[in-house]
Structure formats: C-alpha cells, structure tokens
Design a protein with these regions (language model features):
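Metallo-beta-lactamase
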Residues: 2-4, 77-88, 92, 122-175, ...
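Conserved beta-strand hairpin/beta-sheet module of binuclear metal-dependent hydrolase folds
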Residues: 10, 16-85, 185-199
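Divalent metal-coordination and catalytic microenvironments
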Residues: 11, 46, 60, 93, ...
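Active-site metal-binding loops of divalent metal-dependent hydrolases
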Residues: 16-17, 61-64, 101, 122-123, ...
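Short glycine-enriched, charge-decorated loop/helix-capping segments at active-site entrances
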Residues: 28-32, 71-73, 133-136, 211-217
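A short helix->loop->beta-strand "cap" motif at the edges of active sites that frequently abuts
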Residues: 55, 114-115, 236-238
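Cap/insert and terminal regions of metallo-dependent hydrolase folds
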Residues: 73, 77-81, 185, 189-274
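Active-site metal-binding motif and surrounding structural segment of the metallo-beta-lactamase
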Residues: 73-119
Length: 274
C-alpha cells in the first residue's frame, strides 16, 4: 500500500452509452468461451476535496448522439449535461484530460468553452500523421474531432505532454501507448489511496488480470507494459478502473438512488464481486 500524502480527490464515473457485443469482439485471437460481453462507455470527473476543494478536472468527453447512431451504439445521455447532477457547469471547467482521441473519448469537447485540453504529443502526431490513411487505424477517429483539436491547438488551448505530467497536486498523467501511440492514464490520490483511471489501457478487468490483448491495438508490447504500469501506479489491483467494463457500475456505489446506473463513486472501496 502506497502511503497517502497531501491533496485528495473524489472521482466519479458517468455511464453515458453501451453496446451489445461478444467476447470475441474484445480479445485478439477470439475466445474459447464465446458469449455475450456488453461494453459500457464512460467519462470521469475528478473533484477536489480539502485543500483542493472546488477544483474539477474532467477526463474524456464521450461521443454525441449523432455519432452513436451512426456507429450503432446505444446512447443513454449526454455525459457533459449529466455532470449537472454533480453540480458541475462545463463553462467553469479549466482542465480536460483526453486519454486519447478515439471517437468515444473526445466527442463533446466543444461543450467546454474555456477549458485547456491535455493530451500526449504522440497522440496528436498520430492522428495528423500517415497512419490515418489506413482504415484499421483511422476508423476509430472522427475527422471533425481531430480537426477540432487542431483548431484549438492554434488557439493555445491544447497542452501537449511528453510522458509524465503533474496536472495538479497528486494528479499525474502517464503515457502508456499500446492501444494508440499516445494513450495516457491518470493517477489520482483519493481517501482510499492512489486510484488509476486506466481508460483504454485496460478495457476490461479481464484484460489486466489475464494479460489478454484488446482487438484494437497499435503496439502489443506497449499494451502489456501498460498493464504493469497501471499496477505499479495504483495502490492495489482494486484501485485500477478499466475503461469500458460494466462491472464498474456493479462494484461501486451510485452517488444517489436516483443516479443508480448513471454515476458511481470511485474514491471509495469497491464491493466484492459475486
């Protein structure tokens, strides 16, 4: 267990969409136990407490209803509008972390009129470089999202990082790559210790626990090294939050009974899986 020191934060996961899928959709090489394996889509909110009270950082911004319909996803709610349930006004958010620029992590960015967007330099280079001519890589990006980031960069609102960056006291960004060249994860100190928002460094708990590879990958070596980085940075395996696993909504408590299935808290210990 890593010793707790300094600023602590609350963390919330907002479930905004889902899709029906099979196990073979999520593991390279298929799966001998083929069966249903739905995928949830999340954005995350980090909110300061104590000395960092009032500070809000958003991690990823989801996708729009229009993109959802075109890609065959079930859109439940706008994740940015849902933040009002936490008392968050997007216009008051100063910092948005984009773990990478896939369509389900960067859509709705335009709803943050004043924020700075934090991503890895390698991710910006990837989406504006030669690999986008290949459908295997390019299909997970929305061109208008990429163009939007380029325009914001010209306006001085994109902060590009090379590796580890301290965004705030006890909040750090860490480059891992793998899924995309510029994928980054977020390490946050909470009341229960260091929590790692793994995003797509680990789509499901099973990827991490069994060293399985997700089907969409740029570099498999970096992907499995990313699992080890998540483990090294988190206080325990229970402190790692995968990016798309429906188990997250079952393991962590809802903010309120009315928000069950919509928003859960990640800064408290999880329930034990059945």
């Amino acid at each position: 267990m890593v010793e707790k020191t300094g600023a602590e934060y609350e963390i919330f996961a907002i479930r905004y969409a889902w899709r029906d899928a099979r196990r073979s959709d999520h593991f390279i090489g298929g799966d001998p136990h083929e069966g249903p394996m739905p995928m949830d889509y999340f954005t995350w909110v980090i909110r300061g407490s104590g000395s960092e009270g009032g500070r809000t950082i958003v991690v990823d911004t989801g996708f729009t209803a229009e993109v959802s319909a075109r890609r065959g996803r079930t859109h439940l709610r706008c994740p940015i509008e849902t933040m009002s349930e936490l008392g968050i006004d997007p216009d008051s958010v100063d910092d948005v972390v984009l773990t990478h620029l896939h369509y389900d992590h960067v859509g709705n960015f335009h709803k943050f009129a004043h924020a700075r967007f934090h991503l890895q330099t390698r991710e910006m280079g990837f989406v504006t470089g030669p690999y986008m001519r290949y459908p295997k890589f390019g299909h997970s990006f929305e061109v208008e999202d990429v163009v939007g980031m380029v325009k914001l960069n010209f306006k001085g609102r994109v902060e590009q990082h090379n590796g580890t960056f301290e965004l705030a006291p006890n909040i750090t960004l860490h480059h891992v790559g793998g899924h995309t060249p510029g994928l980054q994860i977020v390490r946050v100190m909470t009341r229960r210790g260091w929590v790692v928002l793994a995003s797509d460094a680990a789509h499901y708990y099973e990827h991490l626990q069994k060293n399985r590879f997700f089907v969409q990958a740029f570099n498999l070596g970096d992907m499995v090294d990313g699992y080890r980085t998540c483990e090294r940075l988190a206080a325990s395996p229970d402190h790692i939050i995968p990016g798309h696993d429906p188990l997250v909504m079952k393991l962590y408590p809802a903010v309120s009974p009315e928000l069950d299935g919509m928003i859960v808290r990640l800064d408290v210990p999880p329930k034990k899986a059945d």
